[in-house]
Regions:
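Short C-terminal boundary/hinge segments that cap the last helix of small helical domains
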Residues: 54-67
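A short, Lys/Arg-rich alpha-helix, primarily the initiator
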Residues: 1-20, 24
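Short, basic-rich loop-to-helix N-cap that marks the start of a DNA-contacting helix
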Residues: 38-51
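Key DNA-contact positions within bacterial/archaeal DNA-binding proteins
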Residues: 19, 30, 58
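Recognition helix of helix-turn-helix/homeodomain-like DNA-binding domains
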Residues: 27-41
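Residue-level detection of the helix-turn-helix DNA-binding "recognition helix"
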Residues: 12, 26, 37, 65
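Residues that mark the N-terminal boundary/hinge immediately upstream of a DNA-recognition element
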Residues: 17, 42-45, 56
Length: 67
């Protein structure tokens, strides 16, 4: 499974709130909800978060092996 838990940590470290993502950067609340639920999102959305947060993909998501 893909986990976006690292996203919330990176946002905190960079001082970017969910409110800022929505209001300043135009991220839809639905995208944020999908990431909170670890649901699938597009590569475009992943790229957008990397640009906004000035980070690498590994700083916002990780693969967790399900057993």
């Amino acid at each position: 499974m893909i986990s976006y838990e690292k996203l919330w940590e990176t946002m905190k470290n960079k001082g970017v709130s969910q409110y800022a993502l929505i209001k300043k950067y135009g991220v839809s609340p639905g995208q944020i909800t999908r990431m909170k639920r670890n649901e699938s999102i597009s590569t475009h959305t992943i790229e957008m978060f990397c640009r906004i947060l000035d980070c690498d993909v590994g700083e916002i998501m990780e693969y967790i092996r399900e057993e």
